[in-house]
Amino acid sequence: MPLILSLKKRTGVHRKKQRGQSLVEFAISSTVLLLLAMGLIDLSRAFYFSVNLQGAAREGARHGAWFNTAGRYNPYLDDADIMQAVNQSLAGAGITANLVTTSGCLVPTDSNSVGNKPYPQSAYPAASQAVNVYICYTDPNGNKYGSLPSHPTDNAWRLGDVDVALLMNFQLITPFIQGIFGQGIDLAYNEHFTIQGKP
């Protein structure tokens, strides 16, 4: 009889130890899973906004490059019309972009000749979740302009280039990821389109 009681006591103690071990394992694994979930939330949001920036830049450049065959001019090759196309594309994401006009085009930090990223930190908006738009017009002779207030009335821009660049200060929302990357990360996308026209 004493042997049976002794076995029962040992089994009960063993079960209590197992429960404590399971609790520790769950605490460690749930912490790791929670950190992964927070990272996925911010990564998913960043991907969502980068896809919206990409689409808006493409839509703005395509809209500006369009050629009216009957009128023989580019009716949307100006700042206001391109910005309207960009903001219509970004409306679904709940963002409104701001046009930044400059005397010249946005100069990348690696000085590449086509105006692609990376861009200087000063070009990004200071406010979180804000978008700056830079439009660069290159005429057929290679002259670059940072602004075009009104569209051309003829076919002079044919085979030129319009480059629409969108730069965003993306706000991270999970505290742990903010601790790693800071308050936000810079997202940028630009799109070139050849300005259409007929000789």
Feature names for model-found ranges:
Residues 1-19:
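N-terminal leader/signal peptides at the extreme start of proteins
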Residues 2-7, 58-199:
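Short, conserved structural patches
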Residues 17, 21-29, 34-71:
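Aliphatic-rich helix starts adjacent to a transmembrane/signal segment
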Residues 7, 14, 31, 40-44, ...:
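A general structural-boundary detector
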